[in-house]
């Protein structure tokens, strides 16, 4: 689960992480009032959406007066902010965060996430702050410092100091950085976060270490332990299809292609997308119906796929173990009739009750394209999508 910048900073404050003062605003007048509460001097008006790169898209503006803060808020609120992470359609700005300005001496990067290859939490730091860390990793990997944290000891002071020295910090800034990094680590662990990222982390002219921006993501499977964080979810920032999928306990992720996929099992779903790509197509989604899906769940999954206007063809790839092929077949038929299926549908079934499932599809009066194996199914659905 993702949250907004202002929410992440609210959490980090509780763990002693230094962040500038700021106030949320949902109207231009509230933004003006927030700037006055901050003293009426220089402030930053920041669009709140679940995407990075806001500054490049016009979503972060400096205001030198409360009146200018109001003007920036008027321009931002309601706009479709486009960044490299929002896609071409952009994301509507519904709220802004007005934050006090500071005199910046240096911009750095500090982030924490799980390194799945090593199986430990990785703390990353870089002198290249304020830019996309993925770009830095690709072009200048030598500029990223890393420390791997033992779950038995946590982040050790010597590791935080080593990062500070690697960033070229000296004097009181080293002490402030160690305190900052320790607070960020404590917040990451205590909240079951999957990502905690400060970009940029700034060193002020006075030597303070501040989180000028903050991003936190959380493990959905641990949210039952954090009802306060779960309450921070913003449905307006999520794909409606993904929200609907959660209601039916479906694993759904929207992608940019035009071939809808419905598969049982995450591994088979990823393999299906790979084979579609190898066959020259582009998957429109990842959708795992799981091993214990019933007819209603399959029907819901089918409707979610077909609600995407970019989908030109659908591939259903089922290996029936716990999941029975006849259940899938009945769900496909029910959903196709309910939504009035008008695009090509390729189905590959294998496993438990496969002959019964194929018989149900054959007598459904639907124009279903059968496939014998995954390679055959991928080729047929790519061809169908191109012809649609």
From Swiss-Prot:
Fetch the Gene3D superfamilies from UniProt.
ATP-grasp fold, A domain, ATP-grasp fold, B domain, Succinyl-CoA synthetase domains
Q: Which residues bind substrate?
A: 264, 321-323
Question: Which cofactor(s) are needed, names only?
Answer: Mg(2+)
What protein name does the entry list? Answer: Succinate--CoA ligase [ADP-forming] subunit beta
Organismal lineage: Bacteria, Pseudomonadati, Myxococcota, Myxococcia, Myxococcales
Q: Which reaction does it catalyse?
A: succinate + ATP + CoA = succinyl-CoA + ADP + phosphate; GTP + succinate + CoA = succinyl-CoA + GDP + phosphate
- Subunit architecture: Heterotetramer of two alpha and two beta subunits.
The role this protein plays is: Succinyl-CoA synthetase functions in the citric acid cycle (TCA), coupling the hydrolysis of succinyl-CoA to the synthesis of either ATP or GTP and thus represents the only step of substrate-level phosphorylation in the TCA. The beta subunit provides nucleotide specificity of the enzyme and binds the substrate succinate, while the binding sites for coenzyme A and phosphate are found in the alpha subunit.
Task: Identify the gene encoding this protein.
Answer: sucC
Q: Which InterPro entries match?
A: ATP-grasp_succ-CoA_synth-type, ATP_grasp_subdomain_1, Succ-CoA_synthase_bsu_CS, SUCC_ACL_C, Succ_CoA_ligase-like_bsu, Succinyl-CoA_synth-like
Residues bound to Mg(2+) are 199, 213
Give the protein family: Belongs to the succinate/malate CoA ligase beta subunit family.
Keyword Protease present in the record's keywords: the answer is no
Q: Which UniProt keywords apply?
A: ATP-binding, Ligase, Magnesium, Metal-binding, Nucleotide-binding, Tricarboxylic acid cycle
